């Protein structure tokens, strides 16, 4: 096999690969063996005709397709390795020369991993990030605990809806006297004053009693997310089926004993404050790291192939689809709800995808420049962390499987973490 390489443009190369006639002839024999049973030739049982006879009846090129695939599948990866090329897309294959007794020659034009010109990534300066724990943060956490432990009581039939009550309702919505999709619900629990429903829907239920039917008039926002409803006036026929009230427990030492491991309110407040501080510190650390990494990326120069951005957008769309699936929504429904299309979403994702690709390329180049590697032990430790997240009872076995099946991913994760640490450790926080 002979391989020559020509640079076509930035990040695009063309390989010319010459496969010896002997090798191509072997590929033709394999193609014949694979396809011979498909041919009916007079004078021969099906699948028994010699190659020469089949070619005479069906043409010289009848076995070329599979022979070409066999040759390319074998030689293309070797050509990439010989020329130390890392492709980021599938190649465009063109046949240059082919024929019985001849060398098989083809070209493969492919987009390759771009070159990265690193700028400064050590000695970077970024503003120090910190978040104080406020008294209101602690109070809000206590109120959330209070809400979670509220007792729900059903109000008497003659009692009316008040703000903060939970109304169990049936409703049906109309626009221009016509019911609209998604405008109907049964036994829906609506907390009055929560702002769950649009406009002043909830306020119009205040004062209503169990068994009462109300007509509620609203106007949808101009940017509601549905072409059918944007800016439209609507009315809802609402039936009040039940009214409930939340009885909030007092936030005192007795409450603390019931909902936590502590005996006094002061002890719980200190614990809440410590946990909020821990979360704030993690947030500040992550934001500082992101700022410094962004600076390192801004200082680097790289011409990113469009196909890499498109591939990243594809990954982002798959992630979105998976998250939506957990909520029982598919992409088409999501597009309808958000008054969008796949094309619009892809365009919206493009900036973030480009940033992700550049960050990955820059971090990989820093790792190369600093000769950072991941040991087998580090990869196994990361696999164990992942296995713990899966909640696997057989930690060692699961970790071993992950270390084998996800080796490249785990290795990249470990190396990236080292790169981030190196850049951050060599940076300077400024006030």
From Swiss-Prot:
UniProt cross-references to InterPro entries, sorted A to Z = PPIase_dom_sf, PPIase_FKBP_dom, Trig_fac, Trigger_fac_C, Trigger_fac_C_sf, Trigger_fac_ribosome-bd_bac, Trigger_fac_ribosome-bd_sf, Trigger_fact/SurA_dom_sf
Give the family, as the similarity comment puts it: Belongs to the FKBP-type PPIase family. Tig subfamily.
Please describe what this protein does: Involved in protein export. Acts as a chaperone by maintaining the newly synthesized protein in an open conformation. Functions as a peptidyl-prolyl cis-trans isomerase.
Keyword Cytoplasm recorded: yes
Q: What is this protein called?
A: Trigger factor
Q: Name the Enzyme Commission number(s) assigned to this protein.
A: 5.2.1.8
Keyword Heme belongs to the record: no
- Which terms under GO biological process does the entry name? 'de novo' cotranslational protein folding; cell division; chaperone-mediated protein folding; protein transport; protein unfolding
């Amino acid at each position: 096999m002979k391989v020559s390489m020509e640079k076509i443009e930035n990040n695009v190369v063309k390989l010319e690969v010459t496969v010896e006639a002997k090798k191509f002839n072997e590929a033709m024999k394999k193609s014949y063996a694979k396809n011979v049973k498909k041919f009916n030739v007079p004078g021969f049982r099906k699948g028994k005709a010699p190659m020469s006879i089949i070619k005479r009846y069906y043409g010289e090129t009848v076995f070329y397709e599979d022979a070409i695939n066999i040759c390319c599948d074998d030689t293309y990866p070797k050509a990439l390795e010989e020329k130390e090329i890392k492709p980021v897309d599938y190649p465009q294959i063109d046949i240059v020369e082919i024929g019985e007794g001849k060398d098989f020659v083809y070209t493969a034009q492919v987009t390759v991993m771009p070159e990265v010109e690193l700028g400064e990534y050590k000695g970077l300066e970024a503003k120090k990030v910190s978040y104080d724990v406020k008294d209101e943060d602690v109070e809000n956490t206590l109120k959330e605990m209070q809400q979670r432990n509220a007792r729900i009581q059903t109000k008497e039939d003659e009692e009316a809806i008040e703000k903060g009550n939970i109304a169990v309702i049936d409703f049906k919505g109309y626009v221009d006297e016509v019911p609209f999709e998604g405008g109907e619900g049964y036994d829906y629990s609506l907390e009055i004053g929560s702002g769950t429903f649009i406009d002043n829907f909830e306020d119009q239920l205040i004062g209503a009693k169990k068994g009462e039917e109300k007509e509620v008039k609203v106007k949808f926002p101009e940017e509601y997310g549905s072409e059918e409803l944007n800016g439209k006036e609507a009315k809802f026929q609402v039936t009040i089926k039940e009214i409930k009230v939340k009885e909030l427990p007092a936030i005192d030492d007795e409450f603390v004993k019931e909902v936590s491991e502590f005996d006094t309110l002061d002890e719980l407040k200190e614990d809440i404050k410590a946990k909020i501080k821990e979360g704030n510190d993690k947030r500040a650390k992550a934001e500082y790291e992101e700022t410094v990494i962004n600076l390192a990326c801004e200082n680097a120069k790289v011409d990113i192939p469009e196909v890499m951005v498109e591939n990243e957008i594809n990954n982002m769309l798959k992630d979105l689809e998976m998250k939506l699936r957990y909520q029982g929504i598919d992409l088409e429904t999501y597009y309808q709800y958000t008054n969008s299309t796949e094309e619009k979403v892809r365009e919206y994702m493009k900036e973030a995808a480009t940033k992700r690709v550049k960050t990955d390329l820059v971090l990989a180049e820093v790792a190369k420049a600093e000769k950072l590697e991941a040991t087998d032990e580090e990869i196994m430790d990361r696999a164990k962390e992942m296995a713990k997240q899966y909640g696997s009872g057989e930690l060692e076995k699961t970790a071993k499987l992950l270390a084998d099946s996800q080796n490249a991913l785990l290795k990249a994760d470990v190396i990236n973490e080292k790169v981030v640490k190196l850049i951050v450790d060599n940076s300077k926080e400024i006030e």
